[in-house]
Structures are given as structure tokens and as C-alpha cells.
């Protein structure tokens, strides 16, 4: 399954400047995703990180992996939504083994590959990788919590 920006925005609450997924190339609901983030010099974080040598902050690469994980975790086998996004919160609650191997700079296309290690109704664990031109630039294990906003 693929998603364009409209499909992504239908599923994620994030908006500019925090929406960090531009396209989904492959998605197996509940299992894995391959998504793209096109890195532009127009990103607001490049103003201060760093003006003389712009580098995408590693924490935002990890956030992009977390957003990708939300996309496939909340999509059912038929491409529909498993839950009402207006009534559900998805929090990044843990990051283990994060490694940043190469800088990500304007003009790069970040390929995000995330696989589920464990999914439950309240806690999910994932393995995420970010690549540029086929080279690993970052990786991390993520843990996310799912909470009802009605509680």
C-alpha cells in the first residue's frame, strides 16, 4: 500500500512544521513501512542548526521514524483507520540504541524503514532505520504509547 501527502495527513495529526513524512512507498499494516522525507533548505530548523553548516537534528530523524510507525500501526488490512485519531493520542515514550552515523543535509531524501517488534493496545515497540542514497544514517529502537483522549 502507498500513501500520498493527503493520505498521510488524513492519518496523522501533525502539520507544518512538524509533519515529517512526505510519501509512503510501501506499507504492510501492523508490520512495516517504508516512507520518504524530502529534506529542504526551507526547513525551519536549518535557521539555527547550523546556519554555516545545515544539518537535520537527529531527534527529528527519530521523530520521523515515530510518525512512520504511527501510520502503519493505525491502518487496518483494508487501508482504513483502526481508531479515531481525534480521540487517540500516540506518544513516543522511549528511544533505545539511537545511533546517528552520517549527517542529513538539505537536498537529501531520507528513506525511513520501520518494522514492528511488538504491538499491543497500549504499548508498541519498533526498529527504525533511516537511509540516504542506500547508506544508513540513523537507527533506533522506539517505544510508543497509545492512549485514549476520552479517559
Swiss-Prot record:
GO terms for molecular function: (3R)-hydroxyacyl-[acyl-carrier-protein] dehydratase activity. The active site is at residue 49. Keywords: Cytoplasm, Lipid A biosynthesis, Lipid biosynthesis, Lipid metabolism, Lyase. It catalyses: a (3R)-hydroxyacyl-[ACP] = a (2E)-enoyl-[ACP] + H2O. Its EC number is 4.2.1.59. One of its GO terms (cellular component) is cytoplasm. It is found in: Cytoplasm. GO terms for biological process: fatty acid biosynthetic process; lipid A biosynthetic process. Pfam families: FabA (PF07977). Belongs to the thioester dehydratase family. FabZ subfamily. Involved in unsaturated fatty acids biosynthesis. Catalyzes the dehydration of short chain beta-hydroxyacyl-ACPs and long chain saturated and unsaturated beta-hydroxyacyl-ACPs. This is 3-hydroxyacyl-[acyl-carrier-protein] dehydratase FabZ. It comes from Bordetella pertussis (strain Tohama I / ATCC BAA-589 / NCTC 13251).
Amino acid at each position: 500500500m502507498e500513501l500520498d501527502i493527503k493520505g498521510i495527513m488524513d492519518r496523522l495529526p501533525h502539520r507544518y512544521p512538524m509533519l515529517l513524512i512526505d510519501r509512503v512507498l510501501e506499507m504492510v499494516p501492523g508490520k512495516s513501512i517504508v516512507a520518504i522525507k524530502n529534506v529542504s533548505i526551507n526547513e525551519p530548523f536549518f535557521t539555527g542548526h547550523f546556519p554555516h553548516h545545515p544539518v537535520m537534528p537527529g531527534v527529528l530523524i527519530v521523530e520521523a521514524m515515530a510518525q512512520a510507525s504511527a501510520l502503519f500501526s493505525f491502518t487496518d488490512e483494508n487501508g482504513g483507520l483502526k481508531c479515531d485519531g481525534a480521540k487517540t493520542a500516540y506518544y513516543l515514550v522511549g528511544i533505545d540504541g539511537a545511533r546517528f552515523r552520517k549527517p542529513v543535509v538539505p537536498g537529501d531524501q531520507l528513506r525511513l524503514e520501520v518494522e514492528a517488534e511488538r504491538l499491543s493496545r497500549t504499548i508498541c515497540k519498533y526498529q527504525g532505520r533511516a537511509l540516504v542514497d542506500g547508506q544508513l544514517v540513523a537507527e533506533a529502537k522506539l517505544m510508543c504509547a497509545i492512549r485514549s483522549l476520552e479517559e
